[in-house]
Amino acid sequence: MNTFGTRLKFTSFGESHGVAVGCIIDGMPAGVKFDEEFLQNELDKRKGGSKFATPRKESDKAQVLSGVFEGYTTGHPIAIVVFNENAHSKDYDNLKDLFRPAHADFTYFYKYGIRDHRGGGRSSARESVARVAGGAVAAMLLCEFGICVQSGVFGIGTFVSNLKEEEFDFEFAKKSEIFCLDPKLESDFKNEILNARNSKDSVGAAVFTKVSGMLVGLGEVLYDKLDSKLAHALMGVNAVKAVEIGEGINASKMRGSCNNDALKDGKFLSNHSGGILGGISNGENLILKTYFKPTPSIFAKQESIDKFGNNLEFELKGRHDPCVGVRGSVVANAMVRLVLADCLLLNASANLNNLKNAYGLK
């Protein structure tokens, strides 16, 4: 599906080598201050063009088509479009009938009977432009409530930071070309990416996300738990293979006496749960880790088949990220923002008092 969210609905459209990529955000309340400069800055973070990302250079200039008037949201659908300006479709002519390993080529073809071979079409990470735009709009709402979502990279390949989560340096990550959270490892991270690129290969990454200023009560019970929604959103990002919340996998190795977050004087003494209990936020920081596989587009010789079942060897052309997880950190951040904004709006009608307050009733 191309639409995400319950109360705040986000729909993306467009393909890697199509005319444009964009999104529609429906359900945003009227009166939210709309910051176009912030929107553009978020899109600029996701852009390629550096030696650590795809050489494909796009201006990624956002055009807001509707839903905003005199600097504020109107309560109507917000449409944002970003035109593709630098697609090299000829690079993919030799892939028209070929299935690239670890891509969506094989599954898209057998599911739909047709696929856009130019850069992967809809399955391309180019679609994430729309997600980042939507996440930026969601952040404008979250900002009104003091909720701040920050993300960065804490692992590249076999190099993983051993810093404690509270020691991750988000200010450094803002200035880092690869959004590195550990200043001491930035050089190793960069070398790992460049070594992969120089050997016609790629490498995976690990992304850390922290949400501060959280409110109590976001999320629902059972099938719409906040952790379920976050995992759903993040697992829908290109190349993501695993998501952890709080202690994550480590919780399976712990005793309950260590994993439980005790309370004293109205405060939690720890945050092993990652800010979520029973599927509902408890007011502590949300803690998430997202793991990206190596970019499947590599330039080493590979084996595959074509749509006729013929075996063949091929070497890929085109422009691709040596580590998709670097720019993926910006996308992961956007998806968390969209989930939280949606939950924030849903919580406004979670009980009678909330509903009465919305109408000024007691």
UniProtKB/Swiss-Prot annotation:
FMN binds at R122, S123, S124, N238, A239, G278, K293, P294, T295, P296, S297, R319. GO terms for biological process: amino acid biosynthetic process; aromatic amino acid family biosynthetic process; chorismate biosynthetic process. NADP(+) binds at R46. GO terms for molecular function: chorismate synthase activity; FMN binding. Keywords: Amino-acid biosynthesis, Aromatic amino acid biosynthesis, FAD, Flavoprotein, FMN, Lyase, NADP. It catalyses: 5-O-(1-carboxyvinyl)-3-phosphoshikimate = chorismate + phosphate. Its cofactor is FMNH2. PROSITE patterns: CHORISMATE_SYNTHASE_1 (PS00787), CHORISMATE_SYNTHASE_2 (PS00788). Its EC number is 4.2.3.5. Pathway: Metabolic intermediate biosynthesis; chorismate biosynthesis; chorismate from D-erythrose 4-phosphate and phosphoenolpyruvate: step 7/7. It comes from the Bacteria. One of its GO terms (cellular component) is cytosol. CDD domains: Chorismate_synthase (cd07304). Reduced FMN (FMNH(2)). HAMAP family: Chorismate_synth. Homotetramer. This reaction introduces a second double bond into the aromatic ring system. Belongs to the chorismate synthase family. This is Chorismate synthase.
